[in-house]
């Protein structure tokens, strides 16, 4: 079958289950697409073709014995390159970890391996997940398959570009301030960040520990639900893992929307690009047609979200990245004169400009003379944002808004303007600060570029968000569109 890349994870699972298709055939199809198209996209940092074919062969053998591990068994995928993979380089997109080969496997990776996933390789990302455009990778920029002169979003840009171009059916990502949802929106696919603590952070290279959360990028909400079924759940090895974390995400798919109230924040519309606002209103109208009630609400504290997010995340990054000093592991400068020179040059040469910028911001915010004025103020802003959401959820079940303020912008257009880059996360960072689940789904196109809309729910409401997006996708075909040169 030559159209296998058009199919969803759910459809591929059915073909494999019915033995209409073998995993080896499926894997060869996607490896061929990776070989053909990745040079145009630069989505992969490394590929693992031999490993993938071995995984696929093992999957076929299990299925012949009636012992498939899960619906995902035998389906190719890719991991964002900050999930540790034993024996396979894990770089976090940085020169600092260019030669780092982990001796252990991240819990998220291990759970998907146990489900029978077929690993095709490690996907590019902004260095240490610090970026919104995937121009900050040591291994070069990733290109948006809808327009290769534009960014795919970040920091999970490799994951988003690979799924959008149909190089793989799904990929993992991580989301600290929008790094799953924003690239999903720019690339015309579905991406979900679960409630903080739902997916284990063990073996995931840290950016900001109180904000980081593993997520999923796929064509559809149904696919995201099937994948989360396998990768989510409490992990005793991760102190931030929540014992209440859900392990079943597809049980509400196809439920009626009657009785569900969707809040539309009026302050999200102020200053929003008119064409994006039109897509948002059209999305709200379809949800209303499907039975939901649309109610205008106000989120009172979101004006401090960007400042609070960048201070907190930079402060945590400055602490997390202290370990990369040229002594323990990671990049080490050549011929250091003394220990001080070793530290200074290893970090100066090993980290890129954006990572060094955020380390400096974080170190400054945590310094004794400025802690109260900056970091503590940001923490108060974070609490206000959570309280604003909790108040909003007394009026509605789910909040609908834009995922991004614009469509994907040209490569290089904001790389020298960090404030403009930061503002691209305007609608996504609040969910991370509050630890809430949030999902972006395709909502149409503007001048040939995808637009995403975002659903934010109360803690552990992922099944409801996934059902809403699933019902929307049953009525639309935005998620089925493929960039012209990748069909």
UniProtKB/Swiss-Prot annotation:
SUPFAM superfamilies named among the record's database cross-references: Amidase signature (AS) enzymes
Gene3D superfamilies the record matches: Amidase signature (AS) domain
UniProtKB keywords: ATP-binding, Ligase, Nucleotide-binding, Protein biosynthesis
Presence of keyword Membrane: no
Transmembrane segments: none
Catalytic residues of the enzyme: 80 (charge relay system), 155 (charge relay system), 179 (acyl-ester intermediate)
InterPro entries linked to this entry: Amidase, Amidase_CS, Amidase_dom, AS_sf, GatA
Assigned EC number: 6.3.5.7
Gene Ontology cellular component terms for the protein in this record: glutamyl-tRNA(Gln) amidotransferase complex
Its job: Allows the formation of correctly charged Gln-tRNA(Gln) through the transamidation of misacylated Glu-tRNA(Gln) in organisms which lack glutaminyl-tRNA synthetase. The reaction takes place in the presence of glutamine and ATP through an activated gamma-phospho-Glu-tRNA(Gln).
PANTHER family, alphabetized: GLUTAMYL-TRNA(GLN) AMIDOTRANSFERASE SUBUNIT A (PTHR11895:SF151), TRANSAMIDASE (PTHR11895)
Family named by the database record: Belongs to the amidase family. GatA subfamily.
Protein name: Glutamyl-tRNA(Gln) amidotransferase subunit A
Naturally occurring in which organism (per UniProt): Dichelobacter nodosus (strain VCS1703A)
Lineage of source species: Bacteria, Pseudomonadati, Pseudomonadota, Gammaproteobacteria, Cardiobacteriales
